[in-house]
Design a protein with these regions (language model features):
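C-terminal alpha-helical cap/extension of soluble enzyme domains
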Residues: 2, 7-10, 31-38, 205, ...
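Active-site beta->alpha loop and helix N-cap motifs at the rims of alpha/beta catalytic domains
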Residues: 2-150, 309
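Alpha-helical structural signal in soluble globular domains
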Residues: 35, 60, 64-68, 93, ...
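A general structural signal for well-ordered alpha-helical segments in protein cores
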Residues: 62, 87, 127, 178, ...
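Active-site glycine- and acidic-residue-rich loops that bind
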Residues: 81-85, 172-173, 250-251, 259
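Catalytic alpha/beta core domains of metabolic enzymes, predominantly
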Residues: 132-133, 144-254
Length: 311
């Protein structure tokens, strides 16, 4: 299975009552999907606030996205649970709602389970059940080491042998950690850099086939161009797009993943789309923190520097 190109991780818009705005979601999927050079579109990831959605809402998001998907693109649905049975149920519901692929959020991101992410058999058991019982292509979400639940290389190599494990969302943190993954696993599955920070460029230039990132819903075509140039070795052109377009957004919206403020980065992403006229609200569900007035000003500056707004 060849995976090549950008996969934007989309947002979940809410209305004034805090319910999912399915009309706005449909428009969001259509808008993002209009860019060229995409492999697919992801829903129900962290950017889509999966942790704030109940099971029925998660399935409804997938169904809405399915109906709005442009032809030729894969619909990738995030699944999340802290039990294997829960993950399987999520996977089956995602499949029933029309997902083509799954993004498997680590079930080990719970204090008492984190050490198990290094245990080959524990990790294999999770993905073996998904492989057999859901039987959809899977993207494994690899967290950075400081999370405490990054999968060991041995565990990743073991699950790469499963028929339906086709890619890793490599939220590795640094180009060096991405290179370590690449050296061990690039001949077995697709390694998709996932960084809404300047470390992305180095990962893309290290033989990546594509990328899966949330920030790319802002000016999706430019992000797709960045991925295209970098993955084809056009380093100078990729650097120009990265420095002139991507970095101002990485700084103002995702704060280089340094968390300088308590602002939810996905709320900040929504606010950018509000300022661009694509969203009507930047509201996020608690406990996420809403975008402050000062942050809105900072986001506007980033959009201006990236050329997405004019004075």
């Amino acid at each position: 299975m060849t995976i090549q190109g950008l996969i934007p991780a989309t947002l979940t818009p809410f209305n004034s009552a805090g319910a999912i705005d399915h009309l706005a979601l449909s428009k969001h999927i259509t808008s993002v999907g209009a860019a060229t050079g995409l492999y697919g579109i992801a829903v129900n990831g962290h950017a889509g606030e999966i942790l704030a959605l109940n099971d029925d809402e998660r399935q409804a998001v997938i169904a809405t996205a399915r109906s709005a998907m442009p032809p030729g693109l894969k619909l990738i649905a995030g699944i999340e649970a802290s039990s294997i049975d829960g993950l399987v149920r999520q996977g089956l519901r995602a499949r029933d709602a029309g997902a083509d692929m799954l993004l498997v959020i680590p079930p080990f991101d719970v204090r008492v389970y984190r050490h198990l992410s290094h245990n080959v058999e524990a990790v294999f058991h999770v993905f073996q059940r998904l492989d057999k019982e859901v039987a959809l292509p899977m993207i494994v979400f690899q967290y950075p080491e400081p999370s405490g639940c990054a999968y060991s290389l041995d565990a990743l190599e073991r699950i790469a042998a499963l028929d339906h494990v086709v890619a890793i969302k490599a939220s590795s943190g640094t180009p060096a950690k991405y290179a370590e993954l690449h050296d061990r696993l690039a001949n077995k599955l697709a390694l998709l850099p996932a960084a809404d920070s300047p470390s992305l460029l180095g990962m893309l230039l290290h033989g990546a086939p594509g990328s899966l990132i949330g920030i790319s819903v802002i000016g999706t075509q430019q992000w797709s161009d960045l991925v295209f140039e970098a993955t084809r070795g056009n380093a100078q052109r990729a650097k120009e797009i990265h420095n002139n377009f991507a970095v101002p957004l990485m700084r103002s919206i995702f704060e280089y993943h340094m968390h300088w403020t308590a602002t939810c980065p996905f709320g900040a992403t929504k606010e950018a789309l509000v300022q661009m006229g694509e969203f009507s609200s930047s509201w996020v569900r608690p406990p996420s923190v809403l975008v402050s007035d000062d942050k809105k000003i900072e986001i506007r500056k980033g959009l201006l520097q990236a050329g997405l707004l004019k004075e």
